[in-house]
Amino acid sequence: MTLQQTIAEYLKYTGQKGLDISAALIDCDGVLYDSMKYHTQAWVKLMKKNGIKCTRDEFYEMEGMTGSEIIKMKFKTGAGKNITDDEAHALYGVKTRYFRELGEAPVMPGAVRVLQALKDADVERVLVTGSQQDTLLERIEKDFPGLFSEAKVTGHDVKRGKPNPEPFLKAMNKADKKPNQCIVIENAPLGVQAAHAAGCFTIGVTTGPIPEKDLFKAGADLVYKNMDELAAALPTLLVALSLVKA
C-alpha cells in the first residue's frame, strides 16, 4: 500500500474529510527511552516476590496500562486477590524501586531526531504516557530540552489507561487539538489501540520484541522498524499528510 493509499484508508475509516497535522502525541517508554527491558524485569521481580507466576513477555503486552491497573489485574488473575488503591500504590512504589536499581534507561536511538524533525515542521510535541514514575518523567527536560510542550498526560492524569482512548483524548483536550490534527507515535499494541480509538493517524515503531504485524492488527496506519527509520521518513510523511487538507 502506498503512503497516499494509507492516508486515504485513514480518512475512510475515520470519516475525516482531511488532515491538518499540528501536533504529535508521543509515548515515553519504548519510544523516547529504551526502558521496557528494565520495566519488564522489575515487574517480574515484584510479582515473583508476591508468589505470582509470570513472564516478561506478558508485561510487554500490557505496556500502556497504568501501574495500578497492571497490579490489580495480575494480583486478581495470579493470586485471586482484590487489591485496593492504597495497596496498588504501595506495590507500585516497590516496583519503582526495583526499576531504579537497574540504572538509567538509555535514550532511544533516533528519538531526538524525531522530535527535532517535528519541531522543525512546527508540529507540537505532546507527551502521552501511562508511566507514573516521576523519576523517568523528570528526565524528559534533561534529555530533550526544549523539545516538548508543557501539555502532557501521564498515568497520574487518567482513570483508565491504554487501550482506553482516554490518555489521547485528554492530551488533545490539553493541546486544544482535534483527532485529524494529530499523529501518534507508539510502540505497543495497547497504545496503538488507544490512539486508533481516539481517531488519530497512528504510527507504530517496533523498538521491542512485539512484531510489526501486531501493531498493524492493533490499528497502526504505518509501522517503522525503529525511531531512526521514522526520523528519516518524517519529512516526506508530513508533506504527504499536509496535502490532504480538510
Predicted feature residues:
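Conserved phosphate-coupling serine/threonine residues in phosphotransfer and NTP-handling enzymes
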Residues: 31, 129-131
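Metal-dependent phosphoesterase signature
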Residues: 9, 75-113
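Conserved SAM-binding loop
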Residues: 32, 107, 125, 184-185, ...
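Asp-based, Mg2+/Mn2+-dependent phosphohydrolase catalytic module
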Residues: 1-22, 116-119, 132-246
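Helix-loop "lid/cap" segments that line or gate small-molecule binding pockets
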Residues: 46-47, 66-83, 139, 172
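Short, surface-exposed acidic
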Residues: 52-61, 79-91, 146-149
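Active-site neighborhood of HAD-like aspartate-dependent phosphohydrolases
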Residues: 2-60
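An amphipathic alpha-helix signature
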Residues: 40, 44, 67-72, 92, ...
